[in-house]
Amino acid sequence: MSAQTSPAEKGLNPGLMCQESYACSGTDEAIFECDECCSLQCLRCEEELHRQERLRNHERIRLKPGHVPYCDLCKGLSGHLPGVRQRAIVRCQTCKINLCLECQKRTHSGGNKRRHPVTVYNVSNLQESLEAEEMDEETKRKKMTEKVVSFLLVDENEEIQVTNEEDFIRKLDCKPDQHLKVVSIFGNTGDGKSHTLNHTFFYGREVFKTSPTQESCTVGVWAAYDPVHKVAVIDTEGLLGATVNLSQRTRLLLKVLAISDLVIYRTHADRLHNDLFKFLGDASEAYLKHFTKELKATTARCGLDVPLSTLGPAVIIFHETVHTQLLGSDHPSEVPEKLIQDRFRKLGRFPEAFSSIHYKGTRTYNPPTDFSGLRRALEQLLENNTTRSPRHPGVIFKALKALSDRFSGEIPDDQMAHSSFFPDEYFTCSSLCLSCGVGCKKSMNHGKEGVPHEAKSRCRYSHQYDNRVYTCKACYERGEEVSVVPKTSASTDSPWMGLAKYAWSGYVIECPNCGVVYRSRQYWFGNQDPVDTVVRTEIVHVWPGTDGFLKDNNNAAQRLLDGMNFMAQSVSELSLGPTKAVTSWLTDQIAPAYWRPNSQILSCNKCATSFKDNDTKHHCRACGEGFCDSCSSKTRPVPERGWGPAPVRVCDNCYEARNVQLAVTEAQVDDEGGTLIARKVGEAVQNTLGAVVTAIDIPLGLVKDAARPAYWVPDHEILHCHNCRKEFSIKLSKHHCRACGQGFCDECSHDRRAVPSRGWDHPVRVCFNCNKKPGDL
């Protein structure tokens, strides 16, 4: 701390002499003030004193021109806060202490101390110096806020307008490691919320847009960073405004409140309305019921290094009046905060979520409004870190993102609030049981975390949904609840043996613990109902997107078809190569002379699509080149090639050039004549066989539809793959997932897995999504 004193520093305070006389005689000019030594010190005394071990860490300041020390007696007493200590007016040379006016009267107004010699400080110079310092500080603060701009944080549809943490920090224009708090403002539309923030934090600059028109100028949630107080300031949309999506916008306010450390409720009414107390009371109840749990989960899910307090923010009710007195003016003995609590109690609202509620009022006889009292109250609360500590901006963004992801989605008109600002319907799952109509009690979007629906009451049976569940009676009596389903065969039977047993003794009910507990045709007569003997029935809720619970899982017919298809497909795949080779050779033998041989056609002559082994190649009857089906789907007469007046297959180019006759010589026509007759005969035979195959396909489709399990989507309703949305065609076959029953292409359903809940105990086809589900299907 000590240093050589320059000549310029000497003579700054010629009236202030060293008060220690430790290394001098007390005649040297004071250069330092040590608050812990309670004295002014010259350079030599300061250096010699603070070489000692016990005095080495004392805080010293270098004196400025016109410096006046603090009073030594009243320093630190209750009632004097740091920064408002009394300055001394005299120094007692005998007692060697500095005294303010009050302490001098109290201690030196009588007795021998009255005759003690004193040194008077120049207080007028001090006042001018302090005013200059305050002016400099005010100018510095204004300069810090000159470049502050606000940005849209969340729009009116509850969608966050910043992409990630880095984008949020960049728009705030603060350091990533800066610790800050969040201050937000609420109130009715037109009460001057944006104007209040501009004058309280930004010295009147229009950081948040204001407007004299009737339309609200603040739509959604806007944010800005105050570098002076190191807070993120959030401006919100006003209540009671003429807006659409009112329910979603009201829910958005509670998300902002949940991430705030300090909330200002701005009201410009001559008397406090009930809307204020109802809003804060309902917000407190919804915060405790829905948000505290989610904020705790956010801490664990996002790996936040700062705990999010379950206590809500502090609230300041900023009340501006014109014609009426402020709250508590007619009851000087009662503080306004107690009157506020009484109003809450009368309305049956209990704001337990908020850490504290404060009242700050101002009466505006003549504009402009005085915001200094609000600013001082805010600064005191921001310094209090007992409940809510400052945190990194990334933590604030993660909390807002987690709340937005959880509590999002449209709110139906029939769930609009009538008696409460924040009804449960704004935050709970909107799914209703299809059987009894009861709503789910879980939070919104709980399905993303794998949490199933749950209702407060029991369900009733509906024949339409068959919402029964069988549980093994023997396991239930042992204290376990094990669900069982009727199915074709036991898990220990092979597929073909299971079909044989099913044909003889009917379906089975198998328990994982007890094995096969029931067969429907175990005896020739006298078979009892399983509900009376081995299972118990429970009625469960039917939520949207789920199937019935005891639908017919007897899939014997489908298993038989699957087995036959597997064998037929295997034989077909083994014989595909030789069959195609023979077909191509035979086609080339009877093809006209101008046709390009199949062996030379490797890709479509127009779109250049490469042909696979099982793809069909088509010849244009006009030019003779090879094409795919889509590039040669048109027909027209080609008499110049000997095909007569009947329309035949041609490529797209020849179809468009149909008015241009090809120059074909008579020699060419004679040469093609013999092979053309052979080709016509071949096509006639092929068309006849194709008609027979089509006639066989129709009853085969009926058989497949009859064998389809009840939970499968019918083939005629499946137009595209349920996962990749590709449209089905002759080349793209339909496949059913044995778990969900939806239609998929082969690429999206190539996994194999047992589905015991549907009666498939051996690995069968399942889709990509069902295969990702944990546990048994």
From Swiss-Prot:
It is found in: Golgi apparatus, Golgi stack; Golgi apparatus; Endoplasmic reticulum; Lipid droplet. Changing residue 733 to R: Partially restored PtdIns3P binding. Changing residue 543 to A: Disrupts its localization to lipid droplets. Zn(2+) 4 binds at residues 737, 740, 767, 770. It comes from the Eukaryota. The keyword Phosphoprotein does not apply. Keywords: Endoplasmic reticulum, Golgi apparatus, Lipid droplet, Metal-binding, Mitochondrion, Repeat, Zinc, Zinc-finger. Pfam families: ANCHR-like_BBOX, FYVE. Zn(2+) 3 binds at residues 721, 724, 745, 748. Zn(2+) 1 binds at residues 604, 607, 628, 631. Changing residue 770 to S: Abolishes PtdIns3P binding but has no effect on its localization to lipid droplets or its interaction with RAB18. Zn(2+) 2 binds at residues 620, 623, 651, 654. SUPFAM superfamilies: FYVE/PHD zinc finger (SSF57903), P-loop containing nucleoside triphosphate hydrolases (SSF52540). One of its GO terms (molecular function) is phosphatidylinositol-3-phosphate binding. GO terms for cellular component: autophagosome; endoplasmic reticulum; endoplasmic reticulum membrane; extrinsic component of omegasome membrane; Golgi apparatus; Golgi stack; lipid droplet; mitochondria-associated endoplasmic reticulum membrane contact site. The keyword Aminoacyl-tRNA synthetase does not apply. A zinc finger (FYVE-type) spans 598-659, 715-775. Its main location: Golgi. One of its GO terms (biological process) is lipid droplet formation. PROSITE patterns: ZF_FYVE. Changing residue 621 to A: Drastically reduce PtdIns3P binding. Abolishes PtdIns3P binding. Plays a role in the formation of lipid droplets (LDs) which are storage organelles at the center of lipid and energy homeostasis. Regulates the morphology, size and distribution of LDs. Mediates the formation of endoplasmic reticulum-lipid droplets (ER-LD) contacts by forming a complex with RAB18 and ZW10. Binds to phosphatidylinositol 3-phosphate (PtdIns3P) through FYVE-type zinc finger. Interacts with RAB18 (in GTP-bound form). Interacts with BSCL2 in a RAB18-dependent manner. Interacts with ZW10. (Microbial infection) Interacts with SARS coronavirus-2/SARS-CoV-2 non-structural protein 6 (nsp6); the interaction is independent of PtdIns3P-binding and leads to endoplasmic reticulum (ER) and double membrane vesicles (DMVs) binding to lipid droplets. This is Zinc finger FYVE domain-containing protein 1. The gene is ZFYVE1.
